[in-house]
Amino acid sequence: MKQQFNQNMDTNPILIPLDVPTSEKAIEIAKNLASHVGGFKVGLELFTYGGKDVVQEIKQFGKELFLDLKFHDIPNTVAKAVANATRLNVDWMTIHCSGGPEMVKAAENAAQETAASLGIKPPVVLGVTVLTSMNQEQLAATGVNDAIEDQVARLAEMTVSNGLRGLVCSPLELPRLKSILPDSIHLVTPGIRAKTDAMGDQKRTLGPKEAMDAGASRLVIGRPITAAPDPAQAAQNIFESLL
């Protein structure tokens, strides 16, 4: 049967974070879930073990690859890191919005120019606003006393005005961001939990269907799938709940 998608879906939006210590374990998870999800996220833990080789191995499954290293440094350093990441032909990558406008512009320019030189599609560089593991008290401890949603909106507008085509945000911020940003901006949301799921590190969460209905482009869903008794069935169940 042909799959039917809701108005915010043109593909399977589920991205699985491969937050495991070895390439072997990551490949095992990817092999089990590849037919049930839209892609996989390689973060710091796995990348510092397997490097570019594990990225290429995960890409063999033919799914989207999200390289989540959250670059945050001086503009020149970030530009060079983004250029190298673009050479891996990933679909998504992250930088921290708090690096400022010059860093943001340098990152987007590096992605576009490197992709053009290689004749490949440029990755979507996503700006990370406020980590979904943070609550209001933790944000204040960093010296930011504004409400989380105000800080997210401020960083989002700055980032988009300097060229980025996407953001990472909690699902709770989706309605506000959709109201202030162009429709073309991709919004990728971790912090996806059903009411019955353990929260883990996540503080600002929403269910998968609610997040898609609020305007998410992609859903990063970890433990509700990977820690389930049958991860493949859990992924399929969540996907079907979105249709």
Where are these regions (language model features)?
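N-terminal amphipathic alpha-helix/helix-capping segment at the start of soluble metabolic enzymes
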Residues: 1-28, 117-120, 174-182, 206, ...
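Conserved anion-binding
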Residues: 8-11, 77-165, 170-173, 180-184, ...
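Hydrophobic faces of well-ordered beta-strands that scaffold small-molecule active sites
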Residues: 12-18, 40-42, 65-69, 93-95, ...
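Active-site beta-loop-alpha junctions enriched in small/polar residues
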Residues: 17-21, 43-47, 72-74, 98, ...
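Short, acidic/polar
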Residues: 21-33, 75-84, 148-158, 203-210
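Structural motif
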Residues: 35, 61, 88, 162, ...
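Glycine-rich phosphate-binding active-site loops on the catalytic face of alpha/beta enzymes
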Residues: 88-101, 191-195, 201-204, 208-234
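C-terminal helical cap(s) of enzyme catalytic domains, especially alpha/beta-barrels
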Residues: 104-114, 212, 225-243
